[in-house]
Amino acid sequence: MRWVLLVAIVAMVGGVAITYRASKKALKAQVPEKPKALPSDLNSNALDWYIQETTKGHPGYHLTAKEYSQVKDSSRLDLSGVRLQLFAKEGDAYDLVTSANATYFTNEHRFFSEGEVQITLNIPMQGEPKHQLVSIQSSGVACNTETNTMDTDQPTSFVFEHGTGHSNGASYDPNSRVLVMKSHVQLDWNPAHPGAKPMKIEAASLIYQETKSEIWLTPWGRLTRGDTVVEGQQDVVRIHEVTEADGKKRTVIHQVEAVKARGSDTYPNRSVQYSADWVLADFDDEGVTRKITGRGSAQLTSTSPTTATEVKAGSVDMEFGARNDESVLERVMATDNAVVTSRPLPAPGRQLSETHVLRSQVVEVRMREGGRDMETVITHAPGTLEFLPNQPAQHHRTLDGNDMVIAYAPQNRIESFHTTGARTRTDPTDEEKKRNQAVSLTASR
């Protein structure tokens, strides 16, 4: 019987050994695979990574990434699937920066993305935006998570509530609310109403001062709306918000100020050109020019099919009406050594009349409906009216007087003339000089 007992013991030991080996094999299969060693230049890597910072109880920034890796012995983090929120100090809004890949230097609070970057400004923390938000696309973007400022030197495109734009390079400071478009700037400002003309803004560089509602164009800028152009140096474009009949609000360009400026309105059968050392142009809510003020070496030329009228003075104020979404010259006030020259233009079947030159300290010109021809010219100070001959039979004449009122018929022909204290001088023609005809002088009260 002893051998039977030995056989049973051996069988039991063998069974235990087999069970142990099977269990060991099963446990070994369940052990997780040993992670791969990190590259020698990395400290760590991870999925779904984030970092955030608060300042005085308010969120400062929140940076998340689908993946990240940290360079060994460095504060540099290489990120992919990146989302950066830069919160306003008031805590009511934030700017959002997204990119496929970026680098963040934690010690420097510096975020940089070499590739394509999408930026959305001033997203409200609660509720829907009151208007379309500013959206920016660029590359090579650097952000500072302490100051929340952004900067790039690469081509940049913008989409905003009233249009689009592009520039080479841009920067934005949410603390001062200043947006800079660095060079080769163009904005296309779309009208709010169907049928109205868009306005194109061009500049060497642009600075948008949001808190002042001003756009600075430096060192030069140009605004074009249909056939209307205003350009100059150190332009300041002022915008303001208007409320529509339905209660909706929109932002419009209402004023442009510039130095060494010039402009033009060119339409079929009429044109206006002007220049001055300093110009202020006012627009209505549809973008139509309504008033232009020129100071210092001010000059205006209004041209119709029959006449070119030139106004020169130290100061010129022009008032415009609006017709069919176009500006129409209605009135000109010239002060400080004003000179108004009306010169007839050649036309088939019509002889040229004299050129009229009016000089006074203050001259007012009122235009006929449609802005092509003069209706009335008034001097609000003593003046001199000179007639320059354009035909051999015409006389050179001068007339001095006070409170002159000159009424014009169509095609800028003098219809009536009134003055007080008149003194005239009429010079003989060349033919009359051959007959020794003398100068004629007259005077009247």
Predicted regions and their residues:
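Mature-chain termini and adjacent capping regions
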Residues: 1-445
